[in-house]
Amino acid sequence: YADAIFTNSYRKVLGQLSARKLLQDIMSRQQGERNQEQGARVRL
């Protein structure tokens, strides 16, 4: 019983961690695109 609770919460934590990493990846990717756009505008 305790083992099931542990694996359940462990899976939940892993899901939160991977979701957070996914969000960070998306955010940094958007930030990079935004920086490239600003650089292109400066060149123009």
Swiss-Prot record:
- Leucine amide: residues bearing it: L44
Q: Where mainly found?
A: secreted
Give the location in the cell. Answer: Secreted
GO MF annotations for this entry? neuropeptide hormone activity
Say if the entry is tagged with keyword Plastid.
no
Keywords on record:
Amidation, Secreted
- Alphabetical GO biological process terms: regulation of protein localization
Q: Which GO terms describe its cellular component?
A: extracellular region
List other remarks: The carboxyl-amidated somatoliberin is twice as active as that having a free carboxyl end.
Biological role:
GRF is released by the hypothalamus and acts on the adenohypophyse to stimulate the secretion of growth hormone.
Q: Please report which protein family the annotation says this sequence is part of.
A: Belongs to the glucagon family.
Q: Any idea what this protein is called?
A: Somatoliberin
The organism named in the record is Sus scrofa (Pig)
